[in-house]
Amino acid sequence: MAWRHLKKRAQDAVIILGGGGLLFASYLMATGDERFYAEHLMPTLQGLLDPESAHRLAVRFTSLGLLPRARFQDSDMLEVRVLGHKFRNPVGIAAGFDKHGEAVDGLYKMGFGFVEIGSVTPKPQEGNPRPRVFRLPEDQAVINRYGFNSHGLSVVEHRLRARQQKQAKLTEDGLPLGVNLGKNKTSVDAAEDYAEGVRVLGPLADYLVVNVSSPNTAGLRSLQGKAELRRLLTKVLQERDGLRRVHRPAVLVKIAPDLTSQDKEDIASVVKELGIDGLIVTNTTVSRPAGLQGALRSETGGLSGKPLRDLSTQTIREMYALTQGRVPIIGVGGVSSGQDALEKIRAGASLVQLYTALTFWGPPVVGKVKRELEALLKEQGFGGVTDAIGADHRR
């Protein structure tokens, strides 16, 4: 029923575009024209579809490969070796877009250097009631309170196993896969939820993410406390180390931007003590920066997009310093240009992710970020991404 509704809305869009206009628009869509997506197609879709319906339609189209193939060719300058793998380019899709592992291959086709799916919870759950996603177009931002809606480990495992051999080849070619793990809303043992995720999906992932920073599951962020985090990660690492050596993924922790200085010091201490493989910095923010213009800015949930950019970059800078640059960081939050990506890399990120930018600019934004990043690396005298990692700390 829901899919028929989405098809009807898409048909309405076809009628609006009209015959000759549709033909030209189809050409621009197929070629991935950046201006057409940013100035015409994406605003039109936003006018026709509510945010969650648009999200579901985007996942559906991506899963079917009905998107322009990336035109930008990755150069050697963009290659990064980190977390035990080669990354063809440092721009990945953040968790939250493909929550259930339905569109992995389409996302690689879009030009991402790595894909992260999830968050995946042990048991299926619906998440919070709708509406739960809100656009702030004036701010190039989104507020969401999805609440870990998930198909569950069993369904996602089935999907990933069906393409396991294909993924092994992609990983070898520099296109790794990450899986973001969450806990069920009603769970009384968070550590066991994450451990179960490691057991089931660990053998199918190149890296796992322990997501303790979503603001939309009650009590989740308290797991970032020093004692709670140490207990949780100790169990997760025990489960990971119990997997067959050939299937032992890296383990990363995803943290919030809304942390005190003491919180950050404690997290850095635990991460170094236990030998965690990396950090993802940051999740969405519950803060509302001054100057937000969107009418829905007061909605409850996590804010992502442009208003998060500087806060996440500063958190990257601090975590890089606190870990002496020895713990790889994936930087996420407000990336929509090569400049945004390079700022995070110079602050200490080895890789970056984006998601909200797709909402406003469409698939061509991936190639745009990579093209601009390469140009800036050359302009600033870097031989490649690797040379720029943490550069601001060496000035």
UniProtKB/Swiss-Prot annotation:
Tell me what this protein is called.
Answer: Dihydroorotate dehydrogenase (quinone), mitochondrial
- Residues in compartment: Mitochondrial matrix: 1-10
Write out the catalytic residues in the record: S214
What does the UniProt PTM comment say about this protein? The uncleaved transit peptide is required for mitochondrial targeting and proper membrane integration.
- Give the cofactors, semicolon-separated: FMN
Where on this chain does substrate bind? K99, N144, R145, Y146, G147, F148, N211, V212, S213, S214, P215, N216, N283, T284
Q: What CDD domains does the entry give?
A: DHOD_2_like (cd04738)
| Classification of source organism | Eukaryota, Metazoa, Chordata, Craniata, Vertebrata
